[in-house]
Structure formats: structure tokens, C-alpha cells
Amino acid sequence: MLLSDRDIRAEFQAGRLGLDPFDDSLIQPSSVDVRLDNLFRVFNNTRYTHIDPAQRQDDLTSLVEPKEGEPFVLHPGEFVLGATLERCTLPDDLAGRLEGKSSLGRLGLLTHSTAGFIDPGFSGHITLELSNVANLPITLWPGMKIGQLCLLRLTSPAQHPYGSSQVGSKYQGQRGPTPSKSYQNFVKSN
């Protein structure tokens, strides 16, 4: 069940749902707007001949921070990692779904390529997979509204929420745009 603005406020007031920093004006009818942090991970296109999800490739991305008061410019066809300004903490019976903002999508900005789902129990900054599919550069301003977090109530609390030892929660507690850790649980079939 998708939570309404009333349900979202009740979850915040009960201390079960966390967004830090919290701004009540960001609550929408069935979501909460999230804002863009000031850190980005850009791909180093000359360090590797290809990306291999089975291998640890520490130098695949570099952390970039625009000068204060300046935007990050995302050029056509580029892909970078960003993060939400807010640290998100979900209880074991709520899951999240990150969606893009319609107004930004109409400019050619994709907020996430594939990983828009946030497991119950997750706590950390949400990594964004930002792509510019327009034919002009797009300026990304730290602090701008970048997406909306929809919250879904599970039919029962998760037995092993994200962050529990049984799940192998490699992104729990992440701060800033976190590079892929796919190599940690990559399985090759024979």
C-alpha cells in the first residue's frame, strides 16, 4: 500500500521514518521530495578498457565536488553517480521507491537507471544514477529537488531487513554517491 501525505507525516511523528535534514514542506500527496547533495562520482574513461562487474575496479570513478555556489554540468550522453542530500532511514515494514521529478524528466534528466528500490531497514544516503538523454548540457545544482521518495507498507515486517547480518547489506550507512560493489557477491554460472 502506497502511503499518503497523512501516513508519511504520521511515520515521521512516530519516529519510525527518518529523513535528515527533514523539511515538512517537501511532503507531497503520496511522496517526499528529496534534494541533490553536492558530491558526484564521474567515470574515469581512460583507466580501464571495459567495466567488469565481477572485478573490483577502485579507480573506475572519481569523487568530484563543484565549487560552492556552482552547479555540476552533466553533458549529453553522460552518466554520473550523485546522492540525496537527505539521509534516509526506513523501518522494517516500509520500503521505498525513488522516482524522478516530472519537470526534470521533461528536460532529459534521468534520476536512476535501474536501482530505484530501497529495502526496508535501509539507512543512508540514496545513490542516484544520473543520465542526460537531452542534446544540451544540464546544470545540476546542489540542494535542488532531484526526485521523490514513495513509501510502501509491507504486508508484514521483513524477517531479515536490510542491514541485518543475513542479507549482506553492502550499502548500509553509505554517505555520498557510492560506487558499485557488485564484485562482492558476483556469481558466475558454469
UniProtKB/Swiss-Prot annotation:
InterPro entries: dCTP_deaminase, dUTPase-like_sf, dUTPase_trimeric. Keywords: Hydrolase, Nucleotide metabolism, Nucleotide-binding. One of its GO terms (biological process) is dUTP biosynthetic process. Signal peptide: none annotated. The keyword Hydrolase applies. It holds the Pfam family DCD. Pathway: Pyrimidine metabolism; dUMP biosynthesis; dUMP from dCTP: step 1/1. The active site is at residue 129. DCTP binds at residues 101-106, 119, 127-129, 148, 162, 174. Its EC number is 3.5.4.30. The record marks 116-117 as: Important for bifunctional activity. Residues 163-190 are annotated as: Disordered. One of its GO terms (molecular function) is dCTP deaminase (dUMP-forming) activity. It catalyses: dCTP + 2 H2O = dUMP + NH4(+) + diphosphate. Bifunctional enzyme that catalyzes both the deamination of dCTP to dUTP and the hydrolysis of dUTP to dUMP without releasing the toxic dUTP intermediate. Homotrimer. Belongs to the dCTP deaminase family. This is dCTP deaminase, dUMP-forming. It comes from Mycolicibacterium gilvum (strain PYR-GCK) (Mycobacterium gilvum (strain PYR-GCK)).
